[in-house]
Amino acid sequence: DVDLTPSWKRITMADAVQNVTGADFMAIEGDDDAAVELAKSVGVDMEGVARKWGNALYETFDQKVEETLIQPTFITMYPVEVSPLAKRSPEDPHLTERYEMFVCGCEMGNAFSELNDPIDQHQRFKAQAEKRANGDEEADMMDEDFVLALEYGMPPTGGLGFGIDRCAMMLCGTDSIRDVILFPTMKPLDSDKKVSKEVSAPAEAAQAAPVVEEKIDFSNVQIEPLFQNQVDF
């Protein structure tokens, strides 16, 4: 049974990984090659993953730890490499002020302090763009307008994105998000017909009769002030 009674357990990602796998990533913090080898040593598939300390830590958590978080748990201190919009932790520059909530082995929410340093943000966007160029479809793209806005200034801020649909899945005991999502994306049954209609639409439009613009007669329209019954004009 899942106990949602406060307060929920709080643990850093690195400590959660060490508790489950025995791998101590903090002992080799910042050493990219050693982190990748440590992840592989506990059975983590690192194929296609950037050879960075933070990516190795996150992949180990994602593949080995997340499914074990049955009781409500806050995972804190996410690596910079997987948190492109989150502010760095003042306690450790390799980590960020970010946490995620997990229940029944599923992420229920993501929250962090917003990064408001334009120089740091630009560097992270560049790193994300390189990941995207190498095939990472989840990586962010460069956003020069956002960086420019940060240069003008943004006060300290933060936010939480909560997975309402996932919470509904847990409370309803369903196995698929499609059972609870309000507006599921569905393939139209007449998708083939729709394509054929779209192809023939230009030809049909060319043959259609010209549209006659109907003129509206405003000659009898009377414009009156608002509240004329309450105000002496």
What are these regions (language model features)?
Residues 88-97, 169-187:
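Conserved, well-ordered active-site substructure
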Residues 81-85, 108-110, 115-119, 168-169, ...:
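Flexible loop/turn segments at secondary-structure boundaries
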Residues 22, 104, 114, 118, ...:
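Short, well-ordered loop/turn and helix-capping segments at boundaries between secondary-structure elements
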Residues 151, 164, 174-199:
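Acidic, carboxylate-rich catalytic segments that either coordinate divalent cations
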Residues 1-108, 127-154, 193-203:
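Metal-assisted phosphate- and nucleotidyl-transfer catalytic regions
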Residues 104-114, 154-172:
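Conserved phosphate/anionic-ligand binding catalytic regions in large, soluble enzymes, centered on
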Residues 197-219:
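Acidic, proline-/serine-/threonine-rich low-complexity intrinsically disordered repeat tracts
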